[in-house]
Amino acid sequence: MATPSGKAAPPNPQVSKRSLPRDASSEVPSKRKNSNPLPTLPRPSGTFVEGSIVRIAMENFLTYDICEVSPGPHLNMIIGANGTGKSSIVCAICLGLAGKPAFMGRADKVGFFVKRGCSKGLVEIELFRTSGNLIITREIDVIKNQSFWFINKKPVTQKIVEEQVAALNIQVGNLCQFLPQDKVGEFAKLSKIELLEATEKSVGPPEMHRYHCELKNFREKEKQLETSCKEKTEYLEKMVQRNERYKQDVERFYERKRHLDLIEMLEAKRPWVEYENVRQEYEGVKLIRDRVKEEVRKLKEGQIPMTRRIEEIDRQRHTLEVRIKEKSTDIKEASQKCKQRQDLIERKDRQIKELQQALTVKQNEELDRQKRISNTRKMIEDLQSELKTAENCENLQPQIDTVTNDLRRVQEEKALCEGEIIDKQREKEMLEKQRRSVSDHITRFDNLMNQKEDKLRQRYRDTYDAVLWLRNNRDRFKQRVCEPIMLTINMKDNKNAKYVENHISSNDLRAFVFESQEDMEIFLREVRDNKKLRVNAVIAPKISYADKAPSRSLNDLKQYGFFSYLRELFDAPDPVMSYLCCQYHIHEVPVGTERTRERIERVIQETRLKQIYTAEEKYVLKTSVYSNKVISSNTSLKVAQFLTVTVDLEQRRHLEEQLKEMNRQLEAVDSGLAALRDTNRHLELKDNELRLKKKELLERKTRKRQLEQKISSKLASIRLMEQDTCNLEEEERKASTKIKEINVQKAKLVTELTGLVKICTSFQIQKVDLILQNTTVISEKNKLEADYMASSSQLRVTEQQFIELDDNRQRLLQKCKELMKKARQVCNLSADQAVPQEFQTQVPTIPNGHSSSPPMAFQDLPNTLDEIDALLTEERSRASCFTGLNPSVVEEYSKREVEIQQLTEELQGKKVELDEYRENISQVKERWLNPLKELVEKINEKFSNFFSSMQCAGEVDLHTENEEDYDKYGIRIRVKFRSSTQLHELTPHHQSGGERSVSTMLYLMALQELNRCPFRVVDEINQGMDPINERRVFEMVVNTACKENTSQYFFITPKLLQNLPYSEKMTVLFVYNGPHMLEPNRWNLKAFQRRRRRITFTQPQ
């Protein structure tokens, strides 16, 4: 390792609460308040180039409280362990020289670079200038996220700082000059075009990049002018061709105009001809109207005598109708009296018929009574015979008692069996209800599980397919296999799912958990190798960690707002829980609330926990190996996606066992119920048999008593029928007497009816005579009314004809006026203007007395509408042959001639402008391309030499596909690290990380020797290099950066190889940090060097 010399100046990061002095030569305050001030660090000797960094000072910046760095003019090796603050110096250079935070690739706000817990930070950089050093100060306000700028202690704007920095050719945004640690990988990603621009800005003359930009702008303008000239030339040719075609169109236009003029004359005469035709029609209609009017008058006079005779006949008819009504009334009264007599006669006939029917009924009843008595006597004889022949009734009561007892016993057994059946049915209904409830509960669990599986299928389809395979092949595994952790975890509260998902990686959340290595190999062989599914699998620890106790009791942490450890927030199978405890220490990670976040500083200092969760953040705590301080980082919690659905698998298994037990109970109940029903059917059959047997015995016992009762009843019935007798002779005599009396009354009524009929007949004859007289009068009236109606009909027709003729006359008169108005408008004559004599042919008279005069030009034209229409059709057909013409053809032709002239002049001007641009491009191209080729050639020479010294090959060339596309020019780097390969372009994908680092470093060294920028910064570019290449590159860096008149170089690295070369022009800056650092006021560089020499001299050879 390189040893420091007298020129080495360690930056000595220091911790202090006091402000940094504003004077560059003032002392740096120490860590302790009572210590003596530390004198300003000695500056390395040597010659600084214009713009080199002389001093860097930081206060409350990233890892530093207060720090001051004094680099050398050539190569500055900044060495220190990771996390000590090397890259903080790089950030200070960038931000102090008006660079943007994005240039470092670390943060987007400048406030993030201020040390944690501080509200303000400060960066001060002193740049070398021959006219006097330039001190740039940047104060950063964290709260406002603003910066305040000072140049030589005077406040200025950021723009002024940027101008001063640019004047010294400092470009912290150019990766060829300033390459931070987080941007090393991006250098290889630079396109050829971007690399060319960065190189131009870094080592090219100041005007080179400006010429390049001008060339690109000129070329773009040239393309626009070429396109414009081409478009205008094509448009001009089309305009000339179109005007050539329009010459013939103009001639055809005038031919068409002659036809249109004749059409206009014919259309002007046509209204006059129409008017004359309508006027003649009007005169004819008026003559017919007057004749019809005279006919109407004669018809009205002929209707008066008929009207008077009809009125006289109406009076006669009214008198006859009154007399007819009177006779009708007399006839009606006589008819009513006749009807009354007829009704009385009919009533007497009905009385006679009723008497005869009553006698017949009594005769029939007597015959029926005799017949019933005979039948009843016969039935009594049959019953007595049956009673005699029937056997004597034996004693059946003991048999009846036995059957009754057996029947009672069977009924009791049946009632008991039916009760048991009802109890079994109730038990079955209760079990079925419970089974439905448990089944519904299981269905709800399955629905929730399906939701989790749907999320798994949508996000990780391969894992989902593997789950399906596992469920179908569980018998192939010897020990327990758990499905992906996200399916087996069951949150006790969905709100806490975010903690678990943020703590467990997504790869493990979808991992299968095995208890056996052999089972896992079988699973992966089938799923990964055979089915080509991308799945994860883990093995649970052999010794279970699931119930391992935390190192600290939760009660001790509740004072900080912690309410649980992660393990207690969810349930999971024992292998899953054991794996998570072992891998993620979920039994040691507490979960807090908003109260925890409010006391986070106290929690970090007092608890010494490694990971904690607050309401919305995750904190990871580490202890620095240097300072023994606690370093914390926090991230916001992401929203939970998979564990928000809660499924208690243990409860589901318990419910499935309940369901199986209920099914077994239901089977037992159904079996018992079937046996009870069989027993009940057997008892019902026995009950029916006993009932039939008892019925037969009872019927045999009661048969004799029934026969005796029937005989006694029949004898009583005969006695009643014999008592109910009737005397038919007496009844016949009474009926005959009543009939004779009724016939006498009937004869008297017939005599009265005959007289009334004669009177009614006389009234009818008189009425008929009156009706005949009325009919004659009505006939005469009808004839007169028919004649009157015919006359009236003719009158109406004639009047209607008159109205129509009069309307037609009015219509024709109005039409004549309209046609006259139209004809005068066509000839441009007003209503009261007289037509001059020379334009008149005839003077027809308008029906209202006004005169009209068509122009004499109409004499040569046809005088009928048919002839005019025929000629119009012919002329229009001729005019229509000239298609595609319009009145603006000539005007457009003339305008186009003018436009062609203007366009020719404009095109000539564009061509002159295009020639000027091409001349400018040629001149600027010569000023830009030749120096650029020389520059690239120099870079290529240096780059090739560097690679040759490493037994590799590399070249740099100017690449473009088209010489005229100046925006496509780029620098192409091609390298070859092995003799067996060809040169390949440097890309982020073809070469390894170490090869890219070597190529980048050598390219920057090639630029270094061209010495255009005041300093270059390369941060940890040797990461990933193999030791051989790293040693070679280091030697080249030392040889290149330590030459005379080269720019300043900052090489930052956390480690170096042993026995590296050292140059007197190198400055080695060691960065140390930690709790055991020597205080700044006690640091004595000379004493340290003396002790180092003494140790070296006293060491044994």
From Swiss-Prot:
Provide the positions where the record notes the PTM Phosphoserine. S25, S35
Give binding positions for ATP: G80, A81, N82, G83, T84, G85, K86, S87
Q: What would you give as a GO molecular function for this chain, any one?
A: DNA secondary structure binding
Task: Tell me the segments the record calls region Disordered.
Answer: 1-44
Q: Does the keyword Phosphoprotein apply?
A: yes
Going by the UniProt record, its keywords in alphabetical order are: ATP-binding, Cell cycle, Cell division, Chromosome, Coiled coil, DNA damage, DNA recombination, DNA repair, Mitosis, Nucleotide-binding, Nucleus, Phosphoprotein, Telomere, Ubl conjugation
Q: Which Gene3D superfamilies does the UniProt entry name for this protein?
A: P-loop containing nucleotide triphosphate hydrolases
Which Pfam families has this protein been placed in?
Answer: SMC_N (PF02463)
The entry's note on the tissues where this protein occurs is: Expressed in testis but not ovary.
Instruction: Please tell me whether the keyword Cell cycle is annotated for this protein.
Output: yes
Q: How is it modified after translation?
A: Sumoylated.
Q: Which GO terms describe its cellular component?
A: cell junction; chromosome, centromeric region; chromosome, telomeric region; cytoplasm; interchromatin granule; nuclear speck; nucleus; PML body
> What subcellular locations does the record give?
Nucleus; Chromosome; Nucleus, PML body; Chromosome, Telomere
- List each coiled-coil range: 207-440, 645-753, 780-828, 888-927
Which parts of the sequence are annotated with region: Flexible hinge? 441-644
GO biological process terms, alphabetically, are: cell division; cellular senescence; chromosome condensation; chromosome segregation; DNA damage response; double-strand break repair via homologous recombination; mitotic cell cycle phase transition; negative regulation by host of viral genome replication
Domain remarks in the entry?
The flexible hinge domain, which separates the large intramolecular coiled coil regions, allows the heterotypic interaction with the corresponding domain of SMC6, forming a V-shaped heterodimer.
What does the record give as the function of this protein?
Core component of the SMC5-SMC6 complex, a complex involved in repair of DNA double-strand breaks by homologous recombination. The complex may promote sister chromatid homologous recombination by recruiting the SMC1-SMC3 cohesin complex to double-strand breaks. The complex is required for telomere maintenance via recombination and mediates sumoylation of shelterin complex (telosome) components. Required for sister chromatid cohesion during prometaphase and mitotic progression; the function seems to be independent of SMC6.
Name the family the entry cites. Answer: Belongs to the SMC family. SMC5 subfamily.
Whom does it interact with, and what assembly results? Answer: Forms a heterodimer with SMC6. Component of the SMC5-SMC6 complex which consists at least of SMC5, SMC6, NSMCE2, NSMCE1, NSMCE4A or EID3 and NSMCE3. Interacts with NSMCE2. Interacts with SLF2; this interaction induces an association of the SLF1-SLF2 complex with the SMC5-SMC6 complex. Interacts with RAD18; this interaction is increased in a SLF1 or SLF2-dependent manner.
Report what the protein is called.
Answer: Structural maintenance of chromosomes protein 5
The beginning of the lineage is: Eukaryota, Metazoa, Chordata, Craniata, Vertebrata
